Amino acid sequence: MAVGPRYFVPFRRRREGKTDYYKRGKLIVAEQPRMVVRKTNRHIIVQMIVAEMEGDKTLVTANSAELLDYGYKGSTSNTPAAYLTGMLFAVKALNADHPAAILDIGLNRATYGAKVFAALKGAVEAGLDVPHGEEILPADERVKGEHIAAYAPDRAGDLVENVESAAQTIMKELA
C-alpha cells in the first residue's frame, strides 16, 4: 500500500497497462476529435471521440461486424476488414459533419502496414482529413485482400471482388 510521503501510486489505468497518459495528453491538447482505432480478436472498432471535463464523448462509431450489412463475407478481424471499417467510419463521420480527426492507435505499436493503418487508409480514401505519412499505409494489394486470396485460394475465393463491391456499397452511403 501507499505508505510514506515518497511513495507514488500510478493511476489505475496505467497500472493495468491500458493508457499511456503522456500520449493521451498530447492528443487532447490538439483540440481535434480523435479517430480511435482498436483491435479485438474478432473485430476492428473505430470511434471518433472528443475529450470533455465530464469524460470522453463518442461522436461516431463503426464496428467491423457492421460490414456484413454491406455484403462483405470475409473475416471481420483481418486487414481488408480494417480498411472497410475505416471507410465506413469516414462515411458516418462525414455524414455527421465531422470532416477531420487525428489518429489515436492507443498502445498498438506503429508498424508499417498494420491493421490500424489499414483503417486509416480506408478513412482517408473515403474523404476524412487525418494527418498521416504515406509510407506507413499498407499496400493496395493488402487492403484488397490479394495476399489472403493467394495464400488460401480455396477459402478466400472471390475476396478481392467482395472487398471492392463492399467498398462501393459503403461509398454510396456518403450523402
From Swiss-Prot:
<dbReference type="GO" id="GO:0006412">
    <property type="term" value="P:translation"/>
</dbReference>
<dbReference type="GO" id="GO:0003735">
    <property type="term" value="F:structural constituent of ribosome"/>
</dbReference>
<comment type="subunit">
    <text>Part of the 50S ribosomal subunit. Contacts the 5S and 23S rRNAs.</text>
</comment>
<dbReference type="GO" id="GO:0008097">
    <property type="term" value="F:5S rRNA binding"/>
</dbReference>
<dbReference type="GO" id="GO:0000027">
    <property type="term" value="P:ribosomal large subunit assembly"/>
</dbReference>
<dbReference type="GO" id="GO:0022625">
    <property type="term" value="C:cytosolic large ribosomal subunit"/>
</dbReference>
<keyword id="KW-0689">Ribosomal protein</keyword>
<dbReference type="InterPro" id="IPR005485">
    <property type="entry name" value="Rbsml_uL18_euk"/>
</dbReference>
<dbReference type="Pfam" id="PF17144">
    <property type="entry name" value="Ribosomal_L5e"/>
</dbReference>
<keyword id="KW-0694">RNA-binding</keyword>
<keyword id="KW-0699">rRNA-binding</keyword>
<comment type="function">
    <text>This is one of the proteins that bind and probably mediate the attachment of the 5S RNA into the large ribosomal subunit, where it forms part of the central protuberance.</text>
</comment>
<keyword id="KW-0687">Ribonucleoprotein</keyword>
<comment type="similarity">
    <text>Belongs to the universal ribosomal protein uL18 family.</text>
</comment>
<protein>
    <recommendedName>
        <fullName>Large ribosomal subunit protein uL18</fullName>
    </recommendedName>
</protein>
